[in-house]
């Protein structure tokens, strides 16, 4: 019994402190019912579901990363939004990272996307034929923000981008959408009529080439930790102004040395990482 307990403890500690690279090396999901365990930036995913790489109104990109796994509610969100976008006469969406087969920290690109309830959707579209597999790894992905970070790039931004964000913000199960400060500002300045959906747009650094949807913890996932609320109104006042008055937040260059990302995960993630 003592040997068994020591083995179990060792496995638990390994999973809880495992590096992002160790999570990325697991290429398949676990069996069993889908469960989001932990928080968006420190958790894992049991029983993940794969997004089909092609569907009506969308195609997945950068699929070699193997980050097209998520909660069923996330997969349904993407496919339903894509159908709405297609019905609105827009070109198919590029779907980026959702999560790894068992969630957990990723070795590049994200601190979140760990419990299957986050997804990146790119502002760039492909109005023509679907991309060949090789093209999906590095498609053109233009920013909606000027290169000098001085405002919206009006040669790229169109009303279709505003419509896309509104359609996403009005979807059920959506907690928030992370967007760049300039995008939020433009919409705050131009949207008329029903502005309630603007509340869902939460400013964060980057997010000028894509927007990041985050869904609520689904019912029946008791180990999923919800995120605190945000704006009481549309978020177009002081919360937005602060992004333009406080010192700018800068990201390190892509080639900067990085410490292995090792968030403290829930103990239950041990079984997720080590399951067959």
What are these regions (language model features)?
Residues 1-4:
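Positively charged n-region of N-terminal signal peptides that target proteins for export
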Residues 6-15:
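Bacterial N-terminal signal peptides
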Residues 16-20:
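Sec/Tat signal peptide C-region and signal peptidase I cleavage site
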Residues 23-26, 77-108, 178-200:
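Extended, low-complexity, intrinsically disordered C-terminal regulatory tails
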Residues 30-96, 156-166, 171:
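Active-site acidic/histidine clusters and adjacent loop/turn architecture
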Residues 86-88, 112-117, 169, 204-207:
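Extracellular/periplasmic catalytic domains that process cell-envelope and extracellular macromolecules
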Residues 100-154:
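Acidic/His-rich structured neighborhood in mature extracellular/periplasmic domains
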Residues 135-276:
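Catalytic cores and adjacent binding grooves of peptidoglycan-active enzymes
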